[in-house]
């Protein structure tokens, strides 16, 4: 057939009108952890949240722990977006988040005592988010005991019911917020089935079905005014008036269910893909993606950790950095910064800039090492091994740099940092090929030095 069919003419429309150009709309700014969590994401989010209109959580549950210091007060957030502190912004819990309702209100109470006000007027919850039941939390603990007995090791779960809830979701037996708010008899029947299903797997699991349902009915009325159709809410946010929208990632790249150090991972996607699926937004609405990385590495629980320092260096980092988990209170394992991991996290997330936190913890060191490559059987490997046994065997190639041996906690701009600290930062930038936008030298908002 010769010629071009009119229907293929991209510029015309039936009737000869021009096709409307698709407007992408507002873009979201994303903050993600680039290691095993505890990088200081809350602090970066807090900086950006001060002039954001909407702050979103897209995955995870109250297994995350974000600490934010405002006017000398320390707030701890687990389920809430840490932007809930901003009285001018809306906080949104997306469909990818799993919600333990008692945990949500407990967290609200604790932070209200510290000065958080009117949070219920600024919180919106997606109707498609899944519910963490009390028995999911009990099962989480029982599974950990079972793993310990069978394999002699455990995953190091927070016992917040996150894994079992995502399991229910994937096996299509989960309960969502929209189910809780519609026909309660239908919800109760499904709740009972789900509880019995878990009891058939764990003979010693006790579930107070009536008691839990009574509690859930009470929470249903409390959250009803906050629940919206999340897809429409996000679409309106993206395509309405210009808005600054911030997405706060929980957990981190190396804890991602697909890309993390499996099986010692969490049960959701904590990389950039989780933003689209956890909020119901298209990829073209992703704007800047900021990776948050500590100037050294930490990990909670077991699993391979190539740059771990089980020596005085590790102890010094643990003590100086106050490395205890916000959610679990467990001591964190410590080691040198691993640029193989950071490069891998960048490959998946496409970071547009980095936030380098806790630089001040390195102030006292004579020499600072950075992992730059892995060797396996004496040969350099150009990838990050997926298999845990192989990752356990890699030897790390280090680059050593002289320490700056002076206090950086008073630095407020780039010029205030000692030359050797500047060199360390530039080394990280050049190795990864991503600029460092912030450098953290202390706990407060003011101690995040903005470089551009």
Swiss-Prot record:
Major site of localization recorded for this protein: cytoplasm
Q: Which residues bind IMP?
A: 38-41, 63-66, 158, 172, 251, 266, 330
The GO molecular function terms of this record are: adenylosuccinate synthase activity; GTP binding; magnesium ion binding
Active site, renumbered: 38, 66
At which positions is substrate bound?
Answer: 38, 326-332
* InterPro entries associated with the record: Adenylosuccin_syn_GTP-bd, Adenylosuccin_syn_Lys_AS, Adenylosuccinate_synth_dom1, Adenylosuccinate_synth_dom2, Adenylosuccinate_synth_dom3, Adenylosuccinate_synthetase, AdSS_1_vert, P-loop_NTPase
| Pathway info | Purine metabolism; AMP biosynthesis via de novo pathway; AMP from IMP: step 1/2
Q: How is the cofactor bound?
A: Binds 1 Mg(2+) ion per subunit.
Assembly, per entry = Homodimer.
The record's similarity note reads: Belongs to the adenylosuccinate synthetase family.
Q: Which CDD domains match?
A: AdSS (cd03108)
Is the keyword Ligase in the record?
Answer: yes
Q: Which residues bind Mg(2+)?
A: 38, 65
* Binding-site residues, GTP: 37-43, 65-67, 332, 358-360, 440-443
Q: Which gene encodes it?
A: adss1
State the UniProt keywords alphabetically. Cytoplasm, GTP-binding, Ligase, Magnesium, Metal-binding, Nucleotide-binding, Purine biosynthesis
- Name the Enzyme Commission number(s) assigned to this protein: 6.3.4.4
**Cellular localisation:** Cytoplasm
UniProt-recorded name of the protein: Adenylosuccinate synthetase isozyme 1
Could you tell me what reaction this enzyme catalyses?
IMP + L-aspartate + GTP = N(6)-(1,2-dicarboxyethyl)-AMP + GDP + phosphate + 2 H(+)
Kindly state one GO CC term assigned in the UniProt record: cytoplasm
Looking at the record, which segments are called Disordered? 1-22
* One record GO biological process: 'de novo' AMP biosynthetic process
Protein task: Component of the purine nucleotide cycle (PNC), which interconverts IMP and AMP to regulate the nucleotide levels in various tissues, and which contributes to glycolysis and ammoniagenesis. Catalyzes the first committed step in the biosynthesis of AMP from IMP.
Output the superkingdom of the source species.
Eukaryota
Its cofactor is: Mg(2+)
Q: Does the keyword Cytoplasm apply?
A: yes
């Amino acid at each position: 057939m010769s010629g071009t069919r009119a229907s293929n003419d991209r510029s015309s429309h039936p009737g000869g009108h021009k096709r409307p150009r698709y407007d992408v709309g507002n873009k979201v700014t994303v903050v993600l952890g680039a290691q095993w969590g505890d990088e200081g994401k809350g602090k970066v989010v807090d900086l950006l949240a001060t002039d954001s209109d909407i702050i979103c959580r897209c995955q995870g549950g109250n297994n995350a722990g974000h600490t934010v210091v405002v006017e000398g007060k320390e707030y701890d957030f687990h389920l809430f977006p840490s932007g809930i502190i901003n009285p001018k912004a809306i906080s949104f819990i997306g469909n990818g988040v799993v919600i333990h309702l008692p945990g949500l209100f407990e967290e609200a109470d604790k932070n209200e005592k510290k000065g958080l006000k009117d949070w219920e007027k600024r919180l919106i919850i997606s109707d498609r988010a899944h519910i963490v039941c009390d028995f999911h939390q009990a099962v989480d603990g029982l599974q950990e005991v079972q793993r310990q007995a069978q394999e002699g090791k455990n995953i190091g779960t927070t016992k917040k019911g996150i894994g079992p809830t995502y399991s229910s979701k994937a096996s299509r037996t989960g309960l969502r917020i929209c189910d809780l708010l519609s026909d309660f008899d239908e919800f109760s029947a499904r709740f009972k089935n789900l509880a019995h299903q878990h009891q058939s797997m764990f003979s010693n699991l006790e579930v107070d079905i009536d008691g839990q349902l009574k509690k859930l009915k009470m929470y249903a009325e409390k959250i009803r005014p906050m629940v919206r159709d999340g897809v429409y809410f996000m679409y309106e946010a993206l395509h309405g008036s210009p808005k600054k929208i911030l997405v706060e990632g929980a957990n981190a790249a190396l804890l991602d269910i697909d890309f993390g150090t499996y099986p010692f991972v969490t049960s959701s996607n904590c990389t950039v893909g989780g933003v689209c699926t956890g909020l119901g937004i298209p990829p073209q609405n992703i704007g800047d993606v900021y990776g948050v990385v500590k100037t050294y590495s930490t990990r909670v629980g077991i699993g391979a950790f190539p740059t771990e320092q089980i020596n005085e260096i590790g102890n010094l980092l643990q003590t100086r950095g106050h490395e205890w988990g916000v959610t679990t209170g467990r001591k964190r394992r410590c080691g040198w910064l691993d640029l193989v991991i950071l490069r891998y996290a960048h490959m998946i997330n496409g970071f547009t800039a980095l936030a380098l936190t806790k630089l001040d913890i390195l102030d006292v060191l004579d020499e600072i090492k950075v992992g730059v490559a892995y060797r396996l059987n004496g040969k350099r490997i150009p990838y990050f091994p997926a298999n845990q046994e192989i990752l356990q065997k890699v030897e790390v190639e280090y680059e050593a740099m002289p320490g700056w041996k002076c206090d950086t906690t008073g630095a407020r701009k780039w010029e205030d940092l000692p030359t050797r600290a500047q060199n360390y930062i530039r080394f990280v930038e050049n190795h990864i090929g991503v600029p460092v936008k912030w450098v953290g030298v202390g706990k407060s908002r003011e101690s995040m030095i903005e470089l551009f």
